[in-house]
Curated annotation (Swiss-Prot):
Keyword annotations from UniProtKB, A to Z: Amino-acid biosynthesis, Cytoplasm, NADP, Oxidoreductase, Proline biosynthesis
Disulfide bonding pattern of the chain: none
Organism domain of life: Bacteria
Gene Ontology CC annotations of this record: cytoplasm
Gene3D superfamilies in the record: Aldehyde Dehydrogenase, Chain A, domain 1, Aldehyde Dehydrogenase, Chain A, domain 2
Annotated family: Belongs to the gamma-glutamyl phosphate reductase family.
Enzyme class: oxidoreductase
Compartments where found: Cytoplasm
Catalytic activities: L-glutamate 5-semialdehyde + phosphate + NADP(+) = L-glutamyl 5-phosphate + NADPH + H(+)
Originating gene: proA
Listed pathway(s): Amino-acid biosynthesis; L-proline biosynthesis; L-glutamate 5-semialdehyde from L-glutamate: step 2/2
GO-annotated biological processes: L-proline biosynthetic process
Taxonomic source organism: Geobacillus thermodenitrificans (strain NG80-2)
Single GO MF descriptor: NADP binding
Protein's name according to its UniProt entry: Gamma-glutamyl phosphate reductase
Amino acid sequence: MNELLEKAERLKTASQTLAMLSTEEKNAALEQIAKAIDRKRAVILAENEKDMAAGRSQGLSPALLDRLQLTNERIDQIISGVRQVASLPDPVGDIIEEWTRPNGLRIQTVRVPLGVIGMVYEARPNVTVDAVSLCLKTGNAVLLRGSSSALHSNKALVSVMKEALRTTAIPETAIELLEDTSRETAQRMFRLNDYLDVLIPRGGAGLIRSVVENATVPVLETGVGNCHIFVDESAERSMAIDIVLNAKLQRPSVCNAIETVLIHERWPYVGELLEALHARGVELRGDRRLAAAYPFVTEATEEDWHTEYLAPILAIKLVTDVDEAIQHIHRYGTKHSEAIITENEAHVRRFFQAVDAAVLYHNASTRFTDGEQFGYGAEIGISTQKLHARGPMGLVAITTTKSLVYGTGQIRTV
């Protein structure tokens, strides 16, 4: 039997054990994982450096290298994320609704695990731990398929977590890493309906499209982040500049960073905003008017409006009003995160009602589209689809429901 099927069978068996565990048992296991990662951080960092060295030699972009890299600070954040998930309320077993029928049947809708989740993701090794902590907390087993560029890091993390589980109620076979990162094995994984209950892809547009187009297993689709900020005519100067700088520059390589700023043509501080971005090393690609007015602005192409740069590059366009901004977002947005900066409440209502995206912001950075920032703990991904879950996906998003019907001998006669 090949690696994929062996691990899938182990996961399916482990998921049956997981579904029966108490919240206390799951939390205790997460604490052991947190302690083990802390204890073995030197090993993890050494393995990550192997991936980083290979990535540099292969010419990976700065954005991908940033996603790949682990540091002591990032490991601290990973450990904190595991403990935060442990501290969150366990949704499994929650009674969502309950009612009694005229014939005396008492019906409950309760929250239960999905079963076995397949995670398909790219260079970010922190996703390995985020996915495991969320899945175990909700009683799900997880098959991890990371990228070849992060294989050393992922193997180290999974080995540490499996070892930690040996002293807990959770079987170590509840976590499996698919070490064969070939395209052929991935395609087989996408069709493993007898073992996997859902696939969750996290990564670039190509990865997500490959999973969506080739999977027969249901997919919880996470989306590309071509995110926009609209700076309205009434936007307060310092607030607008601060938000745009944060949304672009705090971490340009992530999906909730902005890629386009739409500016009302009568906003008085266009030049100050562009100068602030330019001074911080942002490459600006603007419409014809902006390119003609500012020597450091390159004229944008049609492709620029579509592009998720994941880098310190920003497309900028002047618009006549909120409706033109909305139409631009309709055409080029990816339904991830969109923001409006304005003091006009009517424009806020119009923007919120008209724009189709998982998360909309008024006078705040798009960088808050994040499970931890939403209070969910580490996130499993950010969904841009509309079925089952949308936006940052925390614990509830990776559960489903079942109906429990309590009777006293009722039979159906009609």
